[in-house]
Amino acid sequence: MSTTIYSEPDLHQSATSLKLPVWASVSVIIPCYNEERFIGKALGNLAEQYPSEDYEIIVVDGMSDDHTRGVVGEFQQSHPELSIRLLDNPERNIPHALNFGIAAARGEIIARMDAHAAPSGDYIRRCVEVLGEGNAAVVGMPCRVRPGADTAIARAIAIAVSHPFGIGDAKYRLEAKGNEQEDVDTVAFACFSKSLWSELGGFDERLLTNEDYDFNYRVRARGERVILDRLAHCDYFARPTLAKLASQYFRYGRWKARMIRARPRSLKLRQLVAPAFVASIALLAAAGFWRSIAWAALAPELATYLAAAIFFACQATRKQREPFSAMLLLPFVFFTIHFSWGTSFLWGLITPRGNK
């Protein structure tokens, strides 16, 4: 299989503005693996987003062994008017899937989507309109996080991953008033020109996660803008269980650390909060075997964290009118996010770069 190899571009080259025709051609790229539950809904939400003659959807599948490929095939048959392509991704990682799909894309504009995402009916059209204004290199819309299952824990997870106490200031996931555009560090499901992707050398395939933040960091390092527009949105289905959530955030933290090692200037102080919390727990707990005063210091730290988690759990569930069960579960979900992300971030800092 041919592939696009990431190459380090000159991040300081002069920025170029892009003016697009109203109906620029669009290619939607969806990396996926074993997504039989969600891929059909994602395709259904994307099918009528844009004039079919200027539009294609490319599903880059990591050799799924469930019914994902069958669902895509059935959708192709039921929508003969729409160009839907299914490409194989034996590498089974997201940055490779994106590079491979974009290299094969025919569109001037690339829309990076996810099998867990359900964009509003005007998502693609609105992104193209904003790009066409020539004021931004990358455009995205807010995510409305939905439960990944009809269970109390899934509802609690959906609340946690869209709450500032859970995930910090990821603005594309946080509720905001008004329809104003905003400059941001990154967006979840970005639209950008294929020429920009080429100029940047593609997505960095050394980063198996966090490749989108890295891409947008390199865009901003060129002096160009990443804009969050709020006139459309995308529903995103969160992980349904604590085990899957922990696995997701363990992966996020580890690869965030790897990105920071490669690009130290991308570090934000807020990204050190969870690792510092985990490190302090570990150090105080270990030191307590030698000096009991360390355990005495650990107790108020954990009590303060628990109090904050309970406070924000009550606040969030009351605001969203969630049941009492969600409020009881939220502190455990918050801790799962912070401990998984913080632990894996520290692990990513100390392990060799070649270790996956």
Please identify what each model-predicted range represents.
Residues P147, D204-L267:
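Catalytic donor/gating beta->alpha subdomain of glycosyltransferases that bind UDP-sugars
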